[in-house]
Curated annotation (Swiss-Prot):
It comes from the Viruses. This is Uncharacterized 18.4 kDa protein. Pfam families: Pkip-1.
Length: 166
């Protein structure tokens, strides 16, 4: 199970550029002919971009690190601001409700049902990424890439509930 972080960084940069182009198009469309749910779509896209930027920054911070440092980065979850027991419980269960309860997402995103669905999706993908950190015989690049994916989804879901402004 070989993972090439340089290739992943290149791919993530391309995806981020595509998201920026999509955002430009949505903004132009919004001002030319606003639709009812355009603001919600732009919120979701902005959250995705925020998550991608954080993921890319995390990838770049470990791309040239030693394998031992990459493994340490992947295993140390203190930077996620989640209690270790809560993280274990979250990974053991199949319910993506931890973040919904923690951030009162149903109330915060009540006016944006699609954004709430996106919030739950990012919660599920965060848990999947965290679970994959326990993969047996995984190489250091793979573990670092999965931790960065978890960071992406965590930052995106926090953006959706407005934590980026606090």
């Amino acid at each position: 199970m070989e993972t090439d972080l340089a290739a992943i960084v290149h791919k993530k940069r391309a995806l981020l550029n595509a998201a920026f182009k999509q955002q430009d198009k949505k903004i132009a469309k919004y001002f030319a002919k606003p639709c009812e749910n355009d603001a919600e779509k732009m919120l979701m896209l902005a959250a995705e971009i925020h998550g991608q930027v954080e993921q890319l920054e995390a990838l770049l911070s470990v791309a040239r690190a030693s394998d031992a440092d990459k493994r340490e980065f992947a295993r140390d979850c203190s930077d996620l601001d989640i209690d270790a027991q809560d993280l274990q419980r979250m990974c053991a269960s199949n319910e993506p409700t931890y973040f919904a309860a923690k951030y009162d997402a149903a109330t915060v995103l009540a006016a944006h049902p699609a954004a709430y669905d996106g919030f739950l999706g990012h919660s599920e993908r965060f848990v999947d990424a965290m679970r994959s950190l326990n993969a047996p015989n995984a190489d250091a690049d793979y573990l670092a890439q999965r931790k960065c994916a978890a960071i992406r989804h965590l930052c995106a879901l926090e953006y959706l509930v407005g934590l980026h402004t606090k």
